[in-house]
Amino acid sequence: MVSTIGIVSLSSGIIGEDFVKHEVDLGVQRLKDLGLNPIFLPHSLKGLDFIKEHPEARAEDLIQAFSDDSIDMILCAIGGDDTYRLLPYLFENDQLEKVIKQKIFLGFSDTTMNHLMLHKLGIKTFYGQSFLADICELDKEMLPYSRHYFKELIETGKISEIRPSNVWYEERTDFSPKALGTPRVSHANTGFDLLQGNAQFEGEILGGCLESLYDIFDNSLHADSTDLCQKYNLFPDLSDWEGKILLLETSEEKPNPEDFKKMLRTLKETGIFEVINGLLVGKPMDETFYNDYKEALLDFIDSNIPIVYNLNVGHATPRAIVPFGVHAHVDATEQVIRFDYNKES
């Protein structure tokens, strides 16, 4: 299904740095072993400083990745914190719209904003893995659960269903060459946790990293983020959210419970929780603040909205891949999310 995969640095330029070369080389070999032809878009390997200083170059790479018909799939290198800066270079003169076509696009974290950009143009994307975080896993192989979903995506162009992983892993503290071939510390995983509401609900999924969504409404991290996101209407209208399932997951920053509540409150003020069909929430990295987040969700979200917590989606490992814009049937009792590509939500 997928033959050539184009790797883009839309947030951080870290994959161009020497200190991650052992990871990048490993990831490239893994993609080749899967029968893929990986190519790096022209600016993707230019390093942290160049990528930070040149949002227009990042935008050029994304435009090229969509316009180049030899590229079947676009894979984000890694997240970061300022991909919102691509907005004017993609939308001011309809630059992206002129070349846009349905292609597999995969990324997570700060890439949440890129997913929303593509959603504006009607593109269905896939949330949940990136090149450096997943393909370049330092163990002898990709994490088996993560590999299962990546393999299904490249072989079929779809994800048919998501079930819980049997295990979860602690985040590594050492990413140096010394860590090559070493396993992560693993723990038994307890599956999807229905916090409230109906165990079965359905709709198209959209959302992503809570901190990234919060930055659309709060400019304490970047002074111009709210202005740019507002100018280009990045956050979908409430009419767009109606009947959807919101996906939320937290980053490696592991926000403390008060910040988690503040971000939930900001989302609540948009009115989104009045129109969605349900909420899916990823496992926090290292299960930090697991119960605090659970309590906050129950406090803030209206009791009629189903909440399923502890998905293997987001910054905790291993990672499933979630199709956005595809009709999803969630069944917390049966512990499965099924996707129906023939049904319009």
Predicted regions and their residues:
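Charged helix-capping and loop-helix junction motifs
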Residues: 21-24, 55-59, 92, 260-266, ...
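ATP/nucleoside-binding phosphotransfer catalytic cores, i.e., glycine-rich phosphate-binding loops
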Residues: 259, 265-268, 274, 278-345
